[in-house]
Structures are given as structure tokens and as C-alpha cells.
A protein has these predicted regions:
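Non-catalytic interaction surface on structured domains
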Residues: 1-2, 28, 95-96
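Short, surface-exposed secondary-structure edge patches
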Residues: 24-25, 119
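Short, structured protein-protein interaction patches enriched in aromatics and acidic/basic residues
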Residues: 1-24, 32-34
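Gly/Ser/Thr-rich loops at beta-strand to alpha-helix junctions
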Residues: 8-10, 134-137
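Short, well-ordered beta-to-alpha junction loops that form the rim of enzyme active sites
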Residues: 8, 94-95
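N-terminal accessory interaction module
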Residues: 25-52
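Rhodanese-like catalytic fold shared by cysteine-dependent sulfurtransferases
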Residues: 38-46, 55-90, 96-129, 136-174
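Single, functionally critical "micro-switch" positions that shape active/binding sites
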Residues: 30, 92, 134
Length: 174
């Protein structure tokens, strides 16, 4: 058997044990054989694989120098300071019209077809901040753009709920 390493275009890594396959790249060290397809091999240069312990047991962690940086969490205080300074950033509200009608940040653009086209045309290193109610949906949108190669992505930690509680108490919470 061989260990098959796959690294997809989003730099998600997977390991599987199975029979050796023809083609691709093969690396052996003693009794262990690692196989990669040609696309994974191109993404694996410099890859470090480590065994880690967690509450769920042992697993693997991957440190890939070619992977785009993770989505950064931006606090509401950091966003306010950036807006006050006039920093060049793009702020998008990924919630639907119904939620934006309840509470909104004036500086945020709604996440619609026009916003998607705008972001798709921005440089990969543009500062882009996504927000939603509490941060879950905006994190998912940011991760989508991370997989597309964008490198300066931020999720507003706590979303508009945190903004309303910590920055502007006149914005309603829901």
C-alpha cells in the first residue's frame, strides 16, 4: 500500500491509504511510499506534515508555504479605526435584504451580483472585509475568496451584532 497525498486548488490537503497507482510522483522512505498526482506535486513543494494531538485524538497538520494566508478576524474596534483613518478597504454585508433592513453599517455594500463582480475584478491583495449578523456566513464567503487566491481577507468578528453592542448602540440588535 501507499499513502496518497492530494492537495486541491484551494490548498485543502488529504491523506489516504491505498494500493499504489501508476503516474504522478512517488517518494519512498524506508517502508513508507508517498504518492502524489502531478497537480498535488506542484503544490507540495516545501510542505511540512506533522502529527498533532487534539481532544479527538491524533491527526495530521499541514504547513504549506504556497497556501494563501488564512482569513483574518478583524475586531469591530479595528474596523472602526480603519474606517476613521480612511484606510482603503472594501466592506461587504453578506446578509440578505431582510436583515439589512433591520440593522446595517452605512459603509458596507450589500453582497449582490454587482458586489460579486466588483470583488472578482479587485487585485488579489485588496483589503476586503466581510460581515454578517455574527460572523459565520461572512467567514464562509471570505473562505470562498481565499480559495480563489485572495490574500488580504478579513471577517468581522462578531458581525453587526458586535458592532451594535460595542461601537454604535443606536444600531438595533436582533
Amino acid at each position: 500500500d501507499a499513502i496518497h497525498l492530494k492537495i486541491n486548488a484551494g490548498f485543502e490537503h488529504s491523506l489516504a491509504l491505498g494500493p499504489p497507482r501508476a503516474g504522478g510522483l512517488e517518494v519512498s522512505s524506508g517502508p513508507v511510499t508517498l504518492q502524489l498526482d502531478r497537480w498535488s506535486a506542484a503544490r507540495a513543494d516545501g510542505l511540512k506534515i506533522r502529527v498533532r494531538e487534539s481532544l479527538q485524538g491524533q491527526g495530521f497538520s499541514f504547513d504549506n508555504p504556497h497556501a494563501p494566508p488564512p482569513v483574518k478576524q478583524m475586531s469591530v474596534q479595528e474596523l472602526r479605526a480603519a474606517l476613521d483613518r480612511g484606510d482603503k478597504l472594501w466592506l461587504f454585508d453578506v446578509r440578505g435584504d431582510d436583515e439589512r433592513a433591520l440593522a446595517s453599517l452605512p459603509a458596507a455594500k450589500p453582497w449582490d451580483e454587482d458586489a460579486i463582480k466588483l470583488v472578482d475584478g479587485l487585485p488579489a491583495d485588496a483589503t476586503i472585509v466581510f460581515h454578517c449578523h455574527r460572523g459565520g456566513r461572512s467567514q464562509a464567503v471570505a473562505e470562498r475568496y481565499r480559495r480563489k487566491g485572495y490574500t488580504n481577507l478579513h471577517n468581522l468578528a462578531g458581525g453587526i451584532d458586535a458592532w451594535a453592542r460595542e461601537i454604535d448602540r443606536e444600531i438595533p440588535t436582533y
